[in-house]
Amino acid sequence: MYFFSRKTALALVITCSALFFSCNKTEKPLPQQTRSELPEIKQSPRFSGISQQAKTVESASMQGSVWLAYFFFTSCGGPCPAMNARVEALQKEFSAPNLKFVGISVDPETDTPKALAAYAARFHADSTRWTMLQMPMDSVKSVAVQGFMLAQGKEDDPNLHSTRFVVVDKRGMIRGYFDGLDENEIPKLRKAISGLLAE
């Protein structure tokens, strides 16, 4: 009887020890995925235009990249230079090749590829990442209003274009809008870009 008790006790000690060391084994934490908290608003519009390099560029070419879209025109003396200066700063800050910038002219009659090329050079635009586009005015309106859901100005008045930046993720989903002239919006924009690049 005494032998059985010692044997049982020994088995219990071994079992408890095994459980103790098993439960106290340090496990490597699972890597956390960094995801943006921005909502998925809607699919970005399809479009096609002529770039500052006189090449046809389609929105499908942005697939797999995070991109920022905005509207401007080269003869604009108001918000456009400030907005393009913002984009220039973002281009310099973020070196990721899968971050693109797309500026769409709201004055296609004036903003020929040659005019866009001169304007792009003014802001040191890297043509592999920053595209300025000319497209027919009806396409501009459709892309801006129906596609990106931006406010529409008065008929044929390019001065009334939106000053908002539209941020699109790698799958082509619109994820946010940021006022390109509001200093307080820029840190939020930079955070959004960082988050989407990490997705």
Over which residues does each language-model region extend?
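Short active-site neighborhood of thiol/selenol oxidoreductases, capturing the structured segment around
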Residues: 59-81, 86-87
